[in-house]
Swiss-Prot record:
Any Gene Ontology CC annotation: plasma membrane
Location (main, coarse): membrane
Membrane topology listed for this record: Multi-pass membrane protein
Cytoplasmic topological segments: 1-6, 53-59, 109-116, 162-175, 238-243, 290-299
Name used for this protein in its record: Probable amino-acid metabolite efflux pump
GO biological process: cellular response to hydrogen peroxide; cysteine export across plasma membrane
Free-text function comment from the UniProt entry: May be an export pump for cysteine and other metabolites of the cysteine pathway (such as N-acetyl-L-serine (NAS) and O-acetyl-L-serine (OAS)), and for other amino acids and their metabolites.
Primary gene name: eamA
Organism in which the protein naturally occurs: Escherichia coli (strain K12)
Transmembrane segments: 7-27, 32-52, 60-80, 88-108, 117-137, 141-161, 176-196, 217-237, 244-264, 269-289
Example of a GO MF term: efflux transmembrane transporter activity
UniProt keywords, alphabetically: Amino-acid transport, Cell inner membrane, Cell membrane, Membrane, Repeat, Transmembrane, Transmembrane helix, Transport
Localization of this protein: Cell inner membrane
Protein family: Belongs to the EamA transporter family.
């Protein structure tokens, strides 16, 4: 990977890591489902008038939009709104990698290798440590924690739809898929917000919207979604997947660091242990025992 593309990849990692802090800031003055609906409305409009619709079956596009866009962010925004720390959310959301592996095995008959099973087992242990900390110390609201896991599972379901879309005969451009799939969750978000929050709350949040919320929406829509996914998709198309995908492991590192610096969030001892176990599980899933093999060859 060239130095320029390496810098771009790290830029996306930082942008996505900060994403969780921005969500928490944006939720201070707006209901979570309303904020999510406005985010995707800004992603879709006016870009949808300038980007061609991806030539994929409508049922796959709907499935992708309802899982990776609607369900994932409905659960994630509500989780953070209910007290899930932004930094910890950035880490727990990475459970999507393991959900994706298990769904891939079930849906496509993909074989699970030893390193994947070891990574999954270690990450599950890390999640159980976090649950234990939540139940005993109440440092993390259990509802927020479970909603974040639901968001991770929804992301994994979206990955399965994405795999089906990308294996289609007419493989769509990344930006086309991002923008057109953003159209799908807008109405569901607003309807859900209307049911759960009420029209008075929705109208009040729009009438009293402040610059902080506006900037949060701009960041979430244009920087994190359009710019972030645009660069990431370009890099995936330019290089082998194994060169690009592992860099996403740095997202929760940035998420935890930025939450500590900007929101003064601190991990308890058990939370830190759970975080280390999950990150180690992710590392094993991606790299396996490659480091150990390299040491043997070198010696």
């Amino acid at each position: 990977m060239s130095r320029k593309d390496g810098v771009l990849a790290l830029l996306v990692v930082v942008v996505w890591g900060l994403n969780f802090v921005v969500i928490k800031v944006g939720l201070h003055n707006m209901p979570p489902l309303m904020l999510a609906g406005l985010r995707f409305m800004l992603v879709a409009f006016p870009a949808i008038f300038f980007v061609a619709r991806p030539k994929v079956p409508l049922n796959l596009l709907l499935g992708y939009g309802l899982t990776i866009s609607f369900a994932q962010f409905a659960f994630l925004f509500c989780a953070i709104n209910f007290g899930m720390p932004a930094g910890l959310a950035s880490l727990v959301l990475q459970a999507q990698a393991f959900f994706t592996i298990m769904l891939g095995a079930f849906t496509f008959g993909e074989r699970l290798h030893g390193k994947q099973l070891a990574g999954i087992a270690l990450a599950i242990f890390g999640v159980l440590v976090l649950i234990e900390d939540s139940l005993n110390g109440q440092h993390v609201a259990m509802l927020g924690f479970m909603l974040t896991l639901a968001a991770a599972f929804s992301w994994a379901c979206g990955n399965i739809f994405n795999k089906k879309i990308m294996s289609h005969s007419t493989r769509p451009a990344v930006m086309s898929l991002v923008i057109w799939s953003a159209l799908i969750p807008i109405i569901p978000f607003f309807v859900a917000s209307l049911i759960l929050d009420g029209s008075a709350t929705m109208i009040h949040s729009l009438v009293t919207i402040d610059m902080t919320t506006i900037l949060s929406l701009m960041y979430l829509a244009f920087v994190a979604t359009i710019v972030g996914y645009g660069i990431w998709g370009t890099l995936l198309g330019r290089y082998e997947t194994w060169r690009v995908a592992p860099l996403s492991l740095l997202v929760p590192v940035v998420g935890l660091a930025s939450a500590a610096l900007l929101l003064d969030e601190r991990l308890t001892g058990l939370q830190f242990l759970g975080a280390v176990l999950i990150m180690t599980g992710l590392y094993i899933n991606v790299f396996g025992l490659r480091w150990r093999k390299a040491v043997k060859v070198g010696s």
